[in-house]
Amino acid sequence: MTNYYEKFIKLKSESGLHSPSVFELRNNLNLPISVDSCFLCNPYAFELFMNYLKKRDIEDYVKYYPPQNKVLSKILSKNIDVNPDFLMVGNGAIQMIELIMREFESKRKCIITPTFSTYYEIDEQNIFFFKTNKEDNFNLDVNKLIEFCINKEIEVLVIVNPNNPTGTVVTKNDLKKIFKHLPKTSIVVDESFIDFYDTNQSVEKEVYNNKNLIVIRSLSKDFGIAGLRLGYAVCDPKMSEKIFSKYGLCWNINGLAQIFLETMGLPEFQKNYKLAREKYLQGRKVFYNQLSTLKNMKVYESHANFFIIDCGKNINDVFSFLLFEKEIYTRILNDKLHLEDTFLRVACGTEEDNNKVYDALKIIDKKL
């Protein structure tokens, strides 16, 4: 098992601060994976879209160039009820994150930690970290954050909401408070996991009245389509035009992603999607209740589709047992900035997968 772990660490190092995919584990380590609890998506929504995709004739979508970005933005705008002039469609939310953060390279940035590492990987200069801690369940003190940003003369503030990996949230009212007290600060709100919280808490449409606000959304998580690479940003048209003129983004979305955008707007699909979403959210409640019975591990409440667990010991042994003994792939968090090396993240999956994860963790829990 030690040899396998060393090979995994090598593979992990090649992936930077992100996790190797299941494909990489299977192909490079020849590891059987029965449960991918690292992957963050709604499996029921994935199954739903696949059923629609199988009925489509995809030949032309593969053969010909897809429409350009602004055309796809108009298709998306009808589905999400956002003015297309304020939209950029990205090759995954990650493309939007990278391009937007590059526009702020010379700015004084505040990153709330622990959080998604790409925000501080792209540009390591001029970053001021605002740390949350486990004693406060990683909840954000908005008043202290505002004071911090004012004192440090912050020009760009990044808020991942719900946050990854902690699953904590900042309410819409608190976000508006931040906007009010930091009127000259560019604020990036990453809502990649908002669909697992409450879509009414989204600040997408606040962009209309706040030119300094940028909202980033992923379609991969909630719809289970990570392989299609599809996300978007809502921002002031001047910002999007600046990015278009600098980076192009002419054909950055593929034909299969176009099919999804077209399918997304179908009334029947929307009806079935809501049922898939409700089923998944109900399963998350059950999974959290299961995890909360672990006596020697602390499970943190989450408003996303994952949970972080403090195992109270170096996480390597726990991770290795799950992966190499139980064929369960989880997210080891010992590389997360300002997070102790005792934390593990598990994703909510199907009922069957959740039960496998819980049963394996119970075995570990008894040994702690």
Model regions and ranges:
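Active-site phosphate-binding strand-loop segment of PLP-dependent enzymes
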Residues: 137-197, 308
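N-terminal "arm"/small-domain region of PLP-dependent enzymes with the aminotransferase-like
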Residues: 1-64, 78, 152-153
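Short loop-beta-helix segment that forms the pyridoxal 5′-phosphate
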Residues: 77-99
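Conserved PLP-binding catalytic core of the aspartate aminotransferase-like
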Residues: 280-281, 294-326
